[in-house]
Amino acid sequence: MSDQPISRFVVPNLAEMPSDIRERIEAVAERSGFVPNVFVALAARPEEFRAFFAMHDTLMDKSEGLSKAERELIVVATSARNDCLYCIVAHGAILRIRSKRPLLADQVAINPFKADLTDRERHIIDFALQVADDSRSITDDRIDEMRSRGFTDDEIWDIGAITAFFALSNRLANFAGIPPNDEFFTMGR
């Protein structure tokens, strides 16, 4: 995959990026050892980059409610449903690391219904996939069912919001042709 271009569109050089975006990309590269392709691809549109990552961080970096591993679980399952290779691979790597379960991401991406999930994780995935597939079918009874299974309103909202946000992310990565970095494939294994 490494010979593939980062995007079907113009990709800016790091030196040409606004300083706040450049600093964020440099910080990510320092932590991970590489620059994820999505950062470079989205940096071509600075205002969208800022808005995208502000929403991403708001949903994915919360310390209350869903765990960070549960948040990544949603991303992997719904990205697989949306056929987004970038998000499956990138967030699969993060899921493996955060869950400390090296097989989980592959299981969920291939068939979430046969994955080795806890009851709580299965309820999260079932609800996320319903939002992904047919959000109009969500009823008051379905929300009450999630509540009866121990989910708070904030957790239910976050499952839906993460699913919706990554539908956007999946479509951006797919139409722009953003490939996953090779480094993601082996992380957390």
Q: What feature does the model see in each segment?
A:
Residues 1-189:
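Hydrophobic alpha-helical segments
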